[in-house]
Structures are given as C-alpha cells and as structure tokens.
Amino acid sequence: MQITDIRIRKVEKEGKMKAVVSITIDDEFVVHDIKVIEGEKGLFIAMPSRKANDGEYRDIAHPINSATRENIQNMILEKYKTEIENV
C-alpha cells in the first residue's frame, strides 16, 4: 500500500485541531477527514469518525495494524510540517 497523495487543509480557528487531511492510496482510494490534532505529547492524527447512537465516536475507516497507522501518521505529519514552514 502506497500513499500517493496527501492534501492538507489548515484549520484557521484556535483550538487543538490544526488541519483536516485527505489521503489517496495507490491512486485508487481516498480517505477524507483525517484530523491533525495538537495533544499534550505533540501532534497526532485522528481517523475519520462518526458519532454513534450511544454517544461514542467510532472510526469510519482506520488501519488494521499499528505499523500501518504509524506509517500514515508519519507521512501526514511530515507533509503538514513542511506546509506550515512554507506559509
């Protein structure tokens, strides 16, 4: 699996959410609404989610293993930092 495109939309208002990201996988599949969040230990990503009837948020799409999640997160945050530096 290759991430072939990353699109970053910076969030202008103050808060913990810094950007909303779309990734394209293998030039064939797009995942929208991945969030870049500023946490206590630095930046991390949150996969797209929806609020269930019980009030809990559940991921709509997410990696199955931690290595894939880490790879996606590293690529997104690298691109985010590059775009922020170029502003």
From Swiss-Prot:
Gene3D superfamilies: Stage V sporulation protein G (3.30.1120.40)
Keyword check for Zinc-finger: no
Pfam families found in the cross-reference section: SpoVG
UniProtKB keywords: Cell cycle, Cell division, Septation
InterPro entries tied to this protein: SpoVG, SpoVG_sf
GO biological process: division septum assembly; sporulation resulting in formation of a cellular spore
Highest taxon in the source lineage: Bacteria
Role according to the record: Could be involved in septation.
PANTHER family with a match to the protein in the record: SEPTATION PROTEIN SPOVG-RELATED
Family, similarity comment: Belongs to the SpoVG family.
Identification of the protein by name: Putative septation protein SpoVG
Protein source organism: Agathobacter rectalis (strain ATCC 33656 / DSM 3377 / JCM 17463 / KCTC 5835 / VPI 0990) (Eubacterium rectale)
Record gene name: spoVG
